[in-house]
Design a protein with these regions (language model features):
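Conserved PLP-enzyme active-site core in the AAT-like
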Residues: 2-336, 344-366
Length: 366
């Protein structure tokens, strides 16, 4: 389901264009300077002023009482689900979501939770689908304790949940006594693409986090926000998981820098993604949906190459893309320019043309 070509391979030409993921960004010189200047302290006892400033800023951005700094988005999902649920509980989430399929089965390995996978197009499910999956408290069945959504959807194509849909789902969940958790790995992309504030997107959701190591361009870091009580519970799990940190302000400074400099420019990544998808659609044998944000999923069903052969052929020409959820994915980010998109399209066109020529050659030999 997931395939990533070798980025560092001495036998291959160096990577010129990295469309593997928005996690591939290099911290800029200015970001590194902000990191070097940051006042720091012991995060574990709440004494890192830069981490505290970041948490206060993100709590306010998302309209929540409190927030906590984490090393990654994955640990935000893990600590949040551990804080919301107890062993034997059920989590309802879209069948393609990160918590279901890309976290090493944490829910079972660490929590003893059951996943109730929900269907729906583009990584989203409707309030009706959720309603149909809910049951009354019943000693024969798992206690349903949490509903999760992903903003934007990753395997769903980087689509943006509308606030009305999010509101319907949160209202239905809380009317049935379930907590609500939003995986906001790319929530800032959703906000920029839809011109809806992060606070509005997060409104009505019990816990929400944003990732700084994706499109925002920081080397690491995510911030999870919620009520004071919830964040207290999360701190207990952060400690238990070995996630409490020391002079983490060095990294929090990069996140603060990202909030100041790298949010509005996400619109450039979205424009580049649209340009890439439009170019792909003009190549015979390739189909791509117009992206809402920075993830471009595409198919080469009319090309003889398998997805993996295609990814390797691109890599051999210095362009990195990946396979995710069984589909080809190219991702734009702050180290990708419009000129690189044009060049990547040229490489794709060449790979497809070589493939077509080889097939015609084979047929001619028969
Ligand atoms: C990347 C991602 C995560 C995990 O975040 P990391 O910072 O890589 O641990 C979780 N959910 C979604 C939707 C993601 O895309």
């Amino acid at each position: 389901m997931i395939y990533t070509p070798a980025p560092e391979d001495a036998r291959l030409p160096p990577v010129r264009i990295n469309l593997l993921s928005d996690t591939q960004t290099q911290p800029s010189a200015a970001m590194r300077e902000a990191m070097a200047r940051a006042p720091v302290g012991d995060e574990q006892i709440g004494a890192d002023p830069t981490v505290n400033a970041l948490c206060a800023r993100v709590a306010d951005l998302l309209g929540k009482e409190a927030a906590v700094f984490m090393a990654s988005g994955t640990i935000c999902n893990i600590a949040a689900t551990l804080a919301h649920c107890r062993a034997g509980d059920e989590i309802l989430a879209h069948e393609t979501s990160h918590v279901v399929s890309l976290e090493g089965c944490t829910h079972a390995a660490l929590g003893g939770f059951q996943i109730h996978p929900l269907a729906g197009t583009a990584g989203q499910f409707s309030a009706d689908t959720l309603r149909a999956a809910l049951h009354r408290p019943d000693r024969h069945q798992a206690r349903q304790s949490l509903v999760c959504v992903e903003q934007t959807t990753n395997l769903g194509g980087g689509t943006v949940w509308r606030t009305s849909a999010l509101g319907d789902i949160a209202a239905l969940a809380s009317a049935n006594g379930l907590a609500t958790h939003m995986d906001g790995a790319r929530l800032m992309n959703a906000s920029v693409a839809s011109s809806v504030s992060p606070r509005q997107i997060a409104s009505g959701w019990d816990s929400v986090w944003i990732d700084f190591s994706k499109g925002l361009g920081a080397p690491l870091g995510a911030v999870l926000a919620g009520s004071n009580d919830f964040i207290d519970q999360v701190w207990l799990w952060k400690q238990r998981l070995g996630g409490s940190l020391r002079q983490a302000g060095i990294c929090a400074a990069a996140c603060l820098y990202a909030l100041d400099h790298n949010v509005d420019r996400l619109a450039d990544d979205h424009a580049n993604a649209r340009l890439l998808a439009a170019g792909l659609s003009q190549i015979g044998g390739v189909t791509a949906e117009p992206p809402e944000t920075n993830l471009v999923y595409f198919d080469i069903s009319d090309v003889a190459l398998s997805n993996q052969e295609f990814v390797d052929a691109m890599r051999a020409d210095g362009v990195l893309i990946s396979i995710l959820g069984g589909r080809l994915r190219a991702c734009t980010h702050l180290d990708v320019t419009t000129a690189m998109i044009q060049e990547a399209l040229e490489v794709i066109r060449n790979v497809v043309e070589r493939d077509t020529a080889a097939r015609i050659g084979r047929r001619a030999q028969v």
